[in-house]
Amino acid sequence: MKILLLGEYSNVHATLAEGLRALGQDVVLASEGDNWKNYPRDIDLFRESNSTWCGIKTYLKIKTLMPQFENYDVVQIINPVFLPLKAERHYEFYHQLRRNNGKLFLGAFGMDYYWVKAGLDCKTFRYSDFNIGSQVRHREDNDIWIHDWLEGPKGELNRYIADDCDGIVAGLYEYYAGYKPYFPQKLTYIPFPIRKCAEAENPKTGEKIKFFIGIQRSRSSYKGTDIMLRALERVESKYPDACEIVRVENVPFEEYKRLMNDSDVILDQLYSYTPAMNALEAMARGLVVVGGGEPENYEILHENELRPIVNVEPNEESVFNQLCNLIEHRKDIPCMKKQSQLYIARHHDHIKVAQQYLDFWKSKALR
């Protein structure tokens, strides 16, 4: 099968491409590398800045590349906004992809109209990036996302593509829950793909427990990293001889992985029900995740045995108490590390996941 993957979020498409190639598929990945993270790709769509001039150059570059994006059996776009262009500019390229290829699939892997809408209804989720119970989280960054996706052209584009495409793949429970009321027939859930980490066959814990926290300055409040860091600093003050904090800010993915490899515990995404790509990458390396591990996460995977994730409620005290509990029961950490790796092997192995994609794409091709 000839497959085109367009766009990138958190290494999802790059890892999926590896799995598909391992299964003998012909895959091309075109993306801008998810900005400064610089994930691998075959065709580079990187945009240097948000200036108008740079936008014109990027538009012309993509227009020139479009003949290379024809005659594929399957095209999958990472998001409705799958190119480094304004939403209004996408229709031209989307229609070309539809005309000149086989089936087209939409990824529900990140910020989009249906995810924002589900968070704001204060019913779909007990808590999310956009709500705590019945209260909407009004923060500057949240308000920008709400404006962009619910009130602006991004939302219009999202609704158009979701209605027009051949299928929708959700990579997390939250995204699945956002789309399910509207597209139950064309929607499926497939776990994010993760490569097995050969250098982490037997993860060990040193004298101090190393707590890893990745910080995106522009999204710290939105993702709850600021709250998690405050709780972690309190733990460090309480147990100075038992723990160490590894802080990482806005580094490329390869450097991020290197710094993560020597850690024991990762703190990630306070408002999530589920572990996303960074947490899953950490689990493959034998780290224990403190973050989203709600029952819905295990239910959608049909996982009735493993519980490797330290689930926290979206507040500082919950994070603090769970971190203290980890330190006071550090003897359990080696077992939790092994469970993390088994969880990844069972549900997220990139070759198994790639086969699930092939099965879904083929099921739609037969209709």
Language-model region placement:
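Membrane-proximal helix-turn-helix segments that form the acceptor-binding/catalytic region
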Residues: K63, F69-E70, F93-R99, D129-G167
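A short, active-site helix/loop in glycosyltransferases that binds the activated sugar's phosphate group
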Residues: W115-V116, I146-L187, R230
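A charged, aromatic-enriched C-terminal amphipathic alpha-helix characteristic of glycosyltransferases
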Residues: K331-K362
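Acceptor-binding helix/loop patch of EC 2.4 sugar-transfer enzymes
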Residues: Y39-R41, L106-E151, S218, L301-H302
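Short hydrophobic beta-strand element within catalytic cores of glycosyltransferases
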Residues: V288-P295
